[in-house]
């Protein structure tokens, strides 16, 4: 049997081969769940009479020094900012009520939310006590689209804990985080390859 023609394999790269008819990989579906005004919201759940009062959680309210760690929605209406000195917050809103932090209570609520997230995926990355990234790519066949999963999580969180979530849904962590910041409180924002320029390009640089 005569040998066949010689072939040049000098440029052969096995990693560049594609299966015939194969489709490009699909985007992952990443959620970023952010518990709204977490510390202040927990305090108002434990003390319902505070719900409609401007409240800020801080380090040492007795000595009236330190900074604002968290504030509720009524306090936000007065322009209270996280991280600002208590004296500045008091000047903006003389009626504001400063509360001490209760870390054990915050941890308990945070764990409740983690258990809720695990109903939908085990691909969870904590981003602080009140924020998580969830990769729900493998859960879409069971629970629907990323938006549907985010909305179900928000509804379940409110029903079981009283807390609200702002959720961002996107194809990477950066955009999902920006999605959860885009609309608050208690909202879902989808940032896709089709709309990310429309939603994000007009934002101020400090929001990026």
Model-derived segments and spans:
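Gly/Gly-Pro- and Ser/Thr-rich, intrinsically disordered tail segments characteristic of DNA damage-repair
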Residues: 1-208
């Amino acid at each position: 049997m005569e040998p066949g023609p010689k072939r040049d394999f000098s440029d052969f790269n096995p990693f560049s081969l594609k299966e015939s008819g194969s489709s490009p990989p699909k985007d992952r579906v990443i959620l970023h769940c952010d518990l709204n005004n977490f510390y202040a919201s927990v305090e108002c759940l434990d003390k319902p009479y505070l719900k409609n009062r401007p409240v800020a959680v801080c380090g040492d309210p007795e000595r009236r020094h330190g900074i604002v760690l968290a504030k509720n929605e009524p306090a936000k209406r007065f322009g209270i900012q996280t991280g600002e000195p208590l004296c500045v917050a008091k000047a903006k809103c003389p009626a504001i009520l400063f509360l001490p932090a209760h870390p054990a209570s915050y941890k308990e609520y945070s764990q409740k939310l983690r258990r809720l997230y695990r109903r939908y995926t085990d691909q969870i990355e904590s981003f602080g006590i009140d924020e998580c990234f969830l990769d729900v790519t493998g859960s879409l066949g069971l629970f629907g689209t990323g938006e549907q999963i985010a909305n179900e999580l928000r509804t379940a969180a409110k029903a079981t804990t009283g807390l609200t979530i702002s959720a961002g849904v996107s194809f990477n962590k950066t955009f999902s985080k920006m999605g959860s910041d885009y609309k608050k409180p208690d909202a879902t924002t989808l940032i896709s390859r089709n709309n990310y320029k429309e939603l994000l390009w007009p934002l101020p640089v400090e929001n990026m």
